[in-house]
């Protein structure tokens, strides 16, 4: 494994802490897909890298702001639906990605789970 492993492990632990969050690998062993609930609703995709990247959904306004940052780009295949990909190469990027994962969970989770996550 690379030096990026601790960052990937920290992102994985963060994503799995939300209510009814689970990990799946529908795109192969190198893509850690985080889903919410019993269905197939994704809220984040982690690639261990290097570099570690995370793909997630944002609101239109947040997406516009995020895309101004040098470590964020439109996600391949799903970018037109509001998804972006961020490379985690330093601490500020890591902190921003954690907040964006939280936002993506909020956007994708059923209402009852959203309320329990923030109560």
Label for each model-derived stretch:
Residues 1-119:
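Charge-dense, helix-prone N-terminal extensions
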